[in-house]
């Protein structure tokens, strides 16, 4: 969060699991696209946590992955979503998160 504060960016937190088929598909179909990551990194610090390998704070421990959280630089949730998203659906979610962050 310190980096996000320093860079004046919000945070995109993707929580997945190593053996999650839909998490792998999201990475392959959406996050692997350079134009998706370009837009994401313009406004967000990007973090990935695997429930299998990383500590996941309690406020993000919800059933099911992939989980998508958009946080302000202080860690407050401004938007959240669940599931596999194609690039167009992910962009819609980014638009919604951007709108919520301006409230």
Regions found by a protein language model. Name each.
Residues 56-61:
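Short amphipathic alpha-helix with an adjacent loop that forms part of the alpha/beta core around
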Residues 18-21, 29-30, 51-55, 75-77, ...:
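Solvent-exposed loop/turn segments at secondary-structure junctions
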Residues 15, 31-54:
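Thiol-based oxidoreductase modules, predominantly thioredoxin-like and allied folds used
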Residues 7-11, 42-47, 73-76:
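Loop/turn elements at helix/coil->beta-strand transitions in domains of secreted/extracellular proteins
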Residues 63-103:
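Non-catalytic, surface beta->alpha helical segment in thiol-disulfide oxidoreductase systems
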């Amino acid at each position: 969060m310190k980096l996000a504060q320093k860079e004046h960016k919000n945070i995109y937190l993707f929580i997945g699991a190593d053996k999650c088929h839909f998490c792998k598909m999201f990475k392959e179909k959406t996050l692997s696209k350079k134009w998706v990551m370009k837009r994401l990194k313009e406004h967000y610090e990007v973090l990935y946590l695997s429930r299998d390998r990383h500590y996941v704070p309690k406020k993000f421990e919800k059933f099911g992955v992939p989980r998508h959280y958009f946080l302000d630089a202080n860690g407050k949730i401004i938007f959240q979503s669940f599931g596999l998203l194609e690039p167009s659906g992910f962009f819609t979610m980014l638009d919604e998160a951007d709108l919520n962050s301006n409230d």
